[in-house]
Amino acid sequence: MSSSPEKKRRKKLSPESNSLPNDLIVTILARLSQSYYPKLSLVSKTFRAILASPELYQTRILLSRTETFLYVCLSFPGEPNPGWFTLYRKPNQTLTTKKKKNSVHLLAPILNSPPVEFPSLIAVGSYLYAFRAAIEEGTSDSLNCVEVYNTDTQTWIPVPPNKRIFKLQHMKGMLYMKVSKLLSFVAQDAEELAPLFPKLRSLLSTEVVAFKPKVSEGYEVLGFSVNTDLGRGSFCMIEEITYHYDPSVKFRWRRRQGGVWRSLVGLEGLPKFARYSSVKLADCGGKLVVLWHKYVPASGYEEKMVWCAEISLEKRSKKEIWGKIEWFDAVLRVPKYYQFVGAKSATV
């Protein structure tokens, strides 16, 4: 009966055992980088439940352990639904200046993504508010255009027709959504939004703005979505600065209130992009993220590899901004006819 003690030992060490209080497990997990969470979710049902709980996110806030993640939406040929991904750094990996064979970062798929494309994304706290094009049409069914992604539980929250908290009405030709006393949305083009939101004056087309009223008067802009895609070029806004990439002028910047375009200095070590490559920019916690692709010759040029670079920005003067390459990596292999839909960062 030698197996009996061994069974007892395995049972004692089982992840499902209640040897540790849930509060202690939450505190331990909250101190870890979320890059470990996908593998930890495989440990047990208890871990999966804790990793998807709001309590874990609140504990991360209390311990100042929040992180900023980039969420990317891609569409693929033959797939009716777009795919959503999170940019992760692989656990137990260290960056090095030496040439490496294995990728340190990757775009990990998000399960249970909504079956619609949402070109307009706004990050407010730990939530991503996704708006599809229907909001611009002003139809009575426009409320169906909103879906919410809870980044701490990693779940999409639809808005059921019988439980909608959104109120939609026409106000001087613009669409207005009141979610609560502290959060509202407006959808409008840049020219008509300018009188209400002067800080958003730019060359870009502002699609949706999230704001909340201040205690005294006025408003506070919480986030906004803009049309940042111009063919092979791309725009991105970070801390009142508009960054732009175009194959003919490379990387440049200008202040959102206007002014001349200036070249982004530095960027040593950033690979050259292929002529056919579509380059996209995104803000991730105040850093500039660049996404581009290359063909994979081994696939017979039927697949592409999506690459990603993270650039820290330093304002050395009013007329000079330097970009430093923190890292670049191959993050996802895709079919050659994939399309980039959008990207947005959120703090979780």
UniProtKB/Swiss-Prot annotation:
Q: CDD domains under this entry?
A: F-box_AtAFR-like (cd22152)
Q: Which PROSITE patterns match?
A: FBOX
Task: Enumerate the Pfam families for this protein.
Answer: F-box (PF00646), Kelch_1 (PF01344), Kelch_FKB95 (PF25210)
InterPro entries xrefs = F-box-like_dom_sf, F-box/kelch-repeat_ARATH, F-box_dom, Kelch-typ_b-propeller, Kelch_1
Using the record's annotation, list all stretches that form the F-box domain. Answer: 14-60
| Lineage top rank: taxon | Eukaryota
- Spell out the protein name for this chain: F-box protein At2g20380
